[in-house]
Amino acid sequence: AFDSSDQDEEVKALIAAIESGVTQVREPVYLYSGYSRGTNDIGSTYVEIDLTNQRLVFYQKGTPIVDTPIVSGNPDIEGCGTPTGCYALDAKESPAVLTGEDYEANVTYWMPFAGNVGIHDASWRSEFGGNLYLWEGSHGCVNVPYDKAAEIYANIEVGMPVVVYE
């Protein structure tokens, strides 16, 4: 969901509606809204991550501009599976140091979309795709080849939709 209601403004609007005594149908007050209110709420520019097929496709105005194999998180290790859902890109950082309980990784391109889970290059990997994630999976992030991470980073903007599914 890319809509987020403005609770303070919504409370004010509801109080005013109740005090007016007039029955009404109204749209909630939003802090921000999705790219459209039609049948396609994400628009035509977004990142699609297919965990089953270990693939990332970045669509720009409906055209795939990046299509790459990935290594996602290992779903068999608690806390390491890549979360599914619809997100908005939180930030872009280059370079970045990613830290966890038992690791520290230097990456050139960091694009988080779900807290500490994001898309990034993985210079320590020479292969991507297939079933690698089942025995060499990440801690939840989406690892992509360096050149593909650079291309995604150059074209993605904070707030763009990221759709992750199995």
PLM region spans:
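Surface-exposed, secretory/extracytoplasmic low-complexity segments enriched in Ser/Thr/Asn/Gly/Pro
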Residues: A1-E78, C86-Y87, A91-E104, Y109, ...
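Exported/periplasmic cell-wall-interacting domains
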Residues: G81-T84, A96-E166
